[in-house]
């Protein structure tokens, strides 16, 4: 999507369910073997009571949205802030959303709000991405 066709307020979304296999694969790739994500017996002893999805695995959905949908192919991820508000449990479905909030006039750069919602609609992750447009 070109800079000329982007508008403030445009959104893109995708939904995904992260099961135990995806969480284990991410643990292996990231070297984050925290038992809070992988061990139901350990997680049962915590405030969460069951395994939670890695926050960065959730945030990886933003990369897919930005690179494939909005702005799309050829865009370059320049930065991302994140705030983790609620846990997402292994096996739960989430919806990731990006929304264009600003477009620079002097350069092909967009700022987007990034959010992940739980299957119940609560805000689990929020942040802001800066992307160079193709």
UniProtKB/Swiss-Prot annotation:
Keywords for this protein: Fatty acid metabolism, Lipid metabolism, Lyase
One of the GO BP terms on file: fatty acid biosynthetic process
Pfam families: MaoC_dehydratas (PF01575)
Any one GO CC term of the record: fatty acid synthase complex
InterPro entries: Fatty_acid_synthase, HotDog_dom_sf, MaoC-like_dom, UPF0336/Enoyl-CoA_hydratase
EC number of the protein: 4.2.1.119
UniProt superkingdom: Bacteria
UniProt keyword Cytoplasm, yes or no: no
GO molecular function, one term: (3R)-hydroxyacyl-[acyl-carrier-protein] dehydratase activity
Binding site for a (3R)-3-hydroxyacyl-CoA: 32-37, 55, 84
Record-annotated MaoC-like domain positions: 5-119
Cystine pairs: none
Effect of residue 37 to A/N: Almost no activity
Record's function text: Catalyzes the hydration of trans-2-enoyl-CoA with a chain-length of 4-6 carbon atoms, forming the corresponding (3R)-3-hydroxyacyl-CoA.
Subunit structure and binding partners: Homodimer.
Name of the protein in its database record: (R)-specific enoyl-CoA hydratase
Protein species of origin: Aeromonas caviae
């Amino acid at each position: 999507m070109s800079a000329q066709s982007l508008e403030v307020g445009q959104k893109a979304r995708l939904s995904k369910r992260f099961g135990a296999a995806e969480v284990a694969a991410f643990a292996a790739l990231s070297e984050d073997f925290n038992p809070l994500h992988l061990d139901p017996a350990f997680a049962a002893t915590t405030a969460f009571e069951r395994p939670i999805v890695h926050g960065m695995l959730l945030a990886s959905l933003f990369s897919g949205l930005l690179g494939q949908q909005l702005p799309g192919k050829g865009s370059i991820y320049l930065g991302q802030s994140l705030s983790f508000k609620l846990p997402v449990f292994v096996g739960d479905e989430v919806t990731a959303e990006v929304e264009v909030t600003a477009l620079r006039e002097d350069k092909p750069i967009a700022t987007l709000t990034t959010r992940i919602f739980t299957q119940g609609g609560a805000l689990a992750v929020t942040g802001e991405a800066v992307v160079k447009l193709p």
